[in-house]
Amino acid sequence: MCIRDRSKAPLYVREAYECKKFAFVSDYVRLYALYSEGGIYLDTDVIVKKSFDNYLNNGFFSSIEYHKDMVKSLGIIKNDLNKDYTRKEYVEHIRGIGIQSAIFGGEKGNEFLKCCLDFYKDKVFIMQDGSYYDKVILPDILALCAEKYGFKYIEGQQSLGANVNIYPQEIFTGIKNATDNSVAIHCAHNSWRNKSFLQKTSIFLSQYSWGNKLKKILDIIGVR
């Protein structure tokens, strides 16, 4: 599968490509691949712990991505969500709550995947002031499109329309939230970000128990 002619891709994707912001191109391409061919998408830094067989009957599947510290510190539940955990109309997207985009699968031609692709149709990557439209990323886009099928911004399993199933965070998850129930774990190296040497060092240290004390020092001096 490939998009053979870049000129046929949405303007957002073409502009992101020209700006060499390839992570944002990848967001679209992974959706396009699953919609066109079906299958399971994994980032390159994902560890698969268990079989995906139990999830193959879904039209689309992934997990909730819920950053509870961010949600709490920003007052997201009070300020940005309705009482039924749907997004308030004036809020562009919900910070700290989305759908896991490093691990997901879908059937060829699934209407939810088509909805996600359509999100890009009227978007540009380069704004009028020269800045990039990069604040709304794929976990946000998946969540925004899932709203049409009944998605709510709350932890726990959700069975939605179009045979979309969103599982609890621990099933397809980041390394900090991994449990014995996890099927696949995203190590979240964030290779798409521009990192300083100290930031890269901090990430390296975090992989080893002996590096925890040194990493804490880096955290104190502002390296995240």
Language-model-derived ranges and their functions:
Residues 4-27, 42-224:
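Glycosyltransferase-associated regions of secretory-pathway enzymes
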Residues 28-39:
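Small-residue hinge/turn detector
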